[in-house]
């Protein structure tokens, strides 16, 4: 009995630290990018996946202690995919006491009608979904649209654009929507996916599978995701360092002449951004920048977590 109590206490201790870390990361991202302001009505896009559940959960938690007043409304888009469990999200949100709206639009039927069998449907589906969510935000009077992308998503997008698009372009934590009417925010921008996975397991969210439409996963993104996960295991701190690099950009030391005016550099110019070592190697720190060992006692022993996804029959 004492041993069981000790295990439960340790689990609760680790969960509390995990929740605190997620709260801190979300709070810091909100502050750094001024994501949420006094009086904001934040439309939280809820898909039924681990990321959006966690985002809503943490925002609710922060709302209680925030120095500003803001409201939340969860929005789910029921795209009429076969087998979509329509009762799951309303039941969960009613239990949480969250204001919400379920938007029913048969985008699945539109996509199936336009895209031939066997072809990827994600691009068209995404455009349709985006337009509906923008319209819904206007109808609800939402001042911000919150999406559940996390740090790993941002890094994956950076490498996708580098490897396949020839661009140094990631996924911004805050942006103006492509229709020019809405501000989109990503409160989980500083959060690690593995933290979100552990949190979702502990909270026992009713996870809805993401492939009800039958579409194949993005193979390019999966390759990048696997690469980053391998690096995270083999080279602790590399992911944190790369993310830090995205926040410490030095345009004068890149090659984009549209971003920095190299042509104006003359013998009369001042040293720019510390100059360059030119002939010498730059001394780098022994430990990766931005990395600290995880503080959970059983990190090394902890097995990979597995989310219990609802079985749709």
From Swiss-Prot:
Cell compartment(s), UniProt: Cytoplasm
Pathway in which this enzyme or protein is active: tRNA modification
Gene Ontology terms for molecular function: 4 iron, 4 sulfur cluster binding; ATP binding; magnesium ion binding; sulfurtransferase activity; tRNA binding
Cofactor requirement: Mg(2+); [4Fe-4S] cluster
Transmembrane segments: none
PANTHER family assigned to the protein according to its UniProt record, in alphabetical order: AMINOTRAN_5 DOMAIN-CONTAINING PROTEIN, SULFURTRANSFERASE-RELATED
Main function: Catalyzes the ATP-dependent 2-thiolation of cytidine in position 32 of tRNA, to form 2-thiocytidine (s(2)C32). The sulfur atoms are provided by the cysteine/cysteine desulfurase (IscS) system.
Identification of the protein by name: tRNA-cytidine(32) 2-sulfurtransferase
Phylogenetic placement of the source organism: Bacteria, Pseudomonadati, Pseudomonadota, Gammaproteobacteria, Enterobacterales
Gene: ttcA
């Amino acid at each position: 009995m004492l041993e069981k109590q000790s295990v439960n206490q340790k689990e609760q201790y680790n969960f509390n630290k995990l929740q605190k870390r997620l709260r801190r990361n979300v709070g810091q991202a909100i502050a750094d990018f001024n994501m949420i302001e006094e009086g904001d009505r934040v439309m939280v896009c809820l898909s039924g996946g681990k990321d959006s559940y966690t985002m809503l959960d943490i925002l609710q938690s922060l709302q209680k202690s925030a120095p500003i007043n803001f409201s939340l409304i969860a929005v789910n888009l029921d795209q009429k995919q076969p087998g979509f469990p329509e009762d799951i999200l309303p039941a969960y949100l009613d239990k949480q006491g969250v204001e919400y709206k379920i938007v029913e639009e048969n985008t699945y039927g539109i996509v199936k009608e336009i895209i031939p069998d066997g072809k990827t449907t994600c691009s068209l589906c995404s455009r349709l979904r985006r337009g509906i969510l923008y319209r819904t935000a206007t109808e609800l009077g939402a001042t911000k649209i919150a999406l559940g992308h996390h740090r790993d998503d941002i890094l994956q997008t950076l490498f996708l654009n580098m490897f396949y698009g020839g661009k140094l372009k990631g996924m911004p934590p805050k942006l103006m929507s492509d229709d020019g009417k809405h501000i989109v925010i990503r409160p989980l921008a500083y959060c690690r996916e593995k933290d979100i996975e552990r949190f979702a397991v502990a909270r026992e969210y009713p996870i809805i599978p993401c492939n009800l439409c039958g579409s194949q996963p993005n193979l390019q993104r999966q390759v990048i995701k696997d690469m980053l996960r391998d690096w995270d295991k083999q080279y602790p701190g590399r992911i944190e360092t790369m993310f830090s690099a995205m926040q410490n950009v030095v345009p004068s030391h890149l090659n984009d002449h549209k971003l920095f005016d190299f042509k104006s550099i003359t013998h009369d110019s001042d040293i720019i951004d510390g100059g360059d070592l030119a002939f010498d190697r730059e001394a780098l720190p022994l430990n990766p920048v931005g990395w600290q060992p995880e503080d959970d006692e059983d990190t090394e022993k902890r097995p990979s977590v597995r989310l219990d996804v609802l079985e749709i029959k």
